[in-house]
């Protein structure tokens, strides 16, 4: 897909907001993509700490509870491409149960993914819809469980959240790209962590430039 002249909405969390980046204008991944691909416009809807699913118990920081589903209503309706990049905070500190495939309400993660995709398709029918699943981070080896999961939430691994997204995508015709495969940064490797994601989760300026390149490759691979 040729990206030149396109308008892209980016719906995401702290990574999309630019946490860890020292020069937002020059190095946050959406702005890098805009510059490299000669986009018409990028609209950044990233809010740190936010989740796809509804939070049953209020967070200490109220902004964390502005979930993706609610915010999906308030984006630029004229955008050519809608990008959703999230899921890590649902795993790290969301209190919604993971639920079952077939859920359609916002009370579970499964249901929220369905609800979000359904809403985006209805509100932005002429746009190309793309979902990026979480990249590698400090806690995604498939064996480690987070130490302080929300009270009364069952134990699950990060890859299970990713698989739910991948399983739901065919119902709505979204394109999906797994950033744990597409982005060659693994913060569990000390060298890569120090170079690209010092806290094990959020990318620095160099990491955002690599993220931008990965997103560009994925978008350009779409046959449109």
Task: Please state what every model-predicted region is.
Residues 1, 10, 17, 179-187:
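Short alpha-helical interface patches
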Residues 2, 7-9, 15-107, 111:
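Conserved SGNH/GDSL esterase-like catalytic core that processes O-acyl groups on lipids
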Residues 11-12, 132:
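Short hydrophobic segments within beta-strands
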Residues 66-224:
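Alpha-helical cap/lid subdomain in secreted, periplasmic
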